[in-house]
Amino acid sequence: MQNIKCVVVGDGAVGKTCMLISYTTNGFPSEYLPTVFDNYCANLMLDGKPYSLGLWDTAGQEEYDRLRPLSYPQTDVFLICFSIISQSSFENVSTKWFKEVNHHAPGVPIVLVGTKQDIRNDNDSIKKLKERNIELVPYEKGLEKAKEINAIYLEASALTQRGVKNVFDQCIRSVIYPNKLNKKPKKKTCTIM
């Protein structure tokens, strides 16, 4: 059985822990408890082969900025999460999270996840958000950001479990098929004769 280490990062309260609990227990937590550090493990079959997926849940709060990178050594894949209802968490993907993981673990595959995807189809929630001048991060912006950081982009909802299994399947695939999923842009060369 191949072991794969997946470290989950992103701003506080974007839904990292909820997504992990939803995936590992098929349930949704009833209250928000900020994470300091947690581990989960999922044994599964993918493409006919067994895997042990070690899931490392990290704290997104600034006060853990010095502690969090201690979980990065030997990481096989990073999940960078943002909430589709939080522009600041989306902006922090490139200004904080990508910089941090790329500094400590350059070249490790990344899956970018827009959480709380169920809200896209909930007109009541969208109306309430608009009343508070909160715009959803468009799906296309997520795709653009993923391309910018050389990541795969997915959206998921821990509440409805839509897309959650696919997120973790893609984490495994990005490790076992690295060149197929995380294509690096080809560098152009200049030859002088």
Curated annotation (Swiss-Prot):
A Gene Ontology cellular-component term: cell projection
Annotated positions of the Cysteine methyl ester modification: 190
Family annotation (CDD domains): Rho
Short motif (Effector region): ranges: 32-40
Domain of life: Eukaryota
GO BP, sorted A to Z: actin filament organization; aggregation involved in sorocarp development; cell-cell adhesion; cortical cytoskeleton organization; establishment or maintenance of cell polarity; mitotic cytokinesis; regulation of actin cytoskeleton organization; regulation of cell shape
Cleaved propeptide residues: 191-193
Chief location: membrane
Lipid moiety-binding region (S-geranylgeranyl cysteine): 190
Gene3D superfamilies attached to this UniProt entry: P-loop containing nucleotide triphosphate hydrolases (3.40.50.300)
PANTHER family for the chain: RHO FAMILY GTPASE
NCBIfam families xref list: small_GTP
Name of the protein in question: Rho-related protein racF2
Annotated source species: Dictyostelium discoideum (Social amoeba)
